[in-house]
Amino acid sequence: MKIITFGEIMLRLQPFGFERFVQAREYEATFGGGEANVAVSLANFGKDASFVTGLPDNDIGKACLQELHRYGVSTEFVVQKSGRMGIYYCEKGASQRPSKVIYDRAGSVAAGLQVGDIDWKAVFADAEWFHFTGITPALSDNMAEVTLEACKAAKEMGVRISCDLNYRKKLWSKEKAGKVMGQLVPFVDLLIANEADADDVFGIKAAKSDVTKGEIDLEGYRSVAKQLTERFGCNMVAITLRESVSASRNLWSGLLYDGESMFVSKKYDMQIVDRVGGGDSFGAGLIYGLTEGYTPKDALEFAVAASCLKHSVEGDFNMVTVGEVQALAGGDGSGRVQR
């Protein structure tokens, strides 16, 4: 059965290597966006993944579609209109210098989608899962309405729903995010967040934890997950835990709470090649595991391992296989040549 993701995909422009914006004379052009990243990961894992969005009816939109098709993602329900594609500029950090992102996405075709533009009943026919992030309703008031329209249709058709809160302060205020997401999350079966999202969006903070300093208290995050479950009725809450040593080195783990038990993954010490899309690869890994009948603990370990591997891959998309993820989750983190 199909897995549907919905959101905006953008043109990613990045200086080569670790050059800064002020140095760069050339930029590499690729594509990326939260929900598209999830769809590509799932397609790479062998799932029937379909991405729904709005794209400009021009050669840039066509190039984007071709890129998605390259990885086996269905674009049957993509809406194409006259207009522009959102762009984001990415400057990769290193050592103590953090990465930097600049958005140029206002007025994109995706942000301009309206209620009624997408036939959600057709989209969710033969679908088992629907995924979106908090970025999508933040794009515009009408996109918040379209996301709500999608959630209602998915719930009516018995499709399980996941959401990654993905708070972006450059898109909306905490107050507006809390109001809008408070209307959407009650539809969600699996809620995904990072260390700070629950606090930013809903004011639910983990005690004894400091994200900036990389201080993580598991019991504090158990309380966060429990409060989210009780407030919104989610079946599961997953939280990624990133301890930043520097822009080049992070400690990475995650937890999953199912309303009764909390499962905690092993922790990975990562040397980072590209951290963009790390959270999306975690979400894709969870969706894969849960739709394949994994236990909650095994689904979590698969998700964290998939995301760990993504941090070693250039670009938004996670170009790894199920076998590679399973090998790491099973304990093979040596990095030895596979012959």
What do these predicted ranges mean?
Residues 48-135, 325-339:
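Conserved N-terminal subdomain of the carbohydrate kinase-like
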Residues 155-160, 232-235:
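A short helix->loop->beta-strand "cap" motif at the edges of active sites that frequently abuts
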Residues 34-44, 147-153:
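Histidine-anchored nucleotide/phosphate-binding helix
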Residues 20-39:
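Short catalytic helix/loop segments, enriched in acidic residues and glycine
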Residues 262-332, 339:
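Conserved post-catalytic alpha-helical subdomain immediately downstream of the catalytic base
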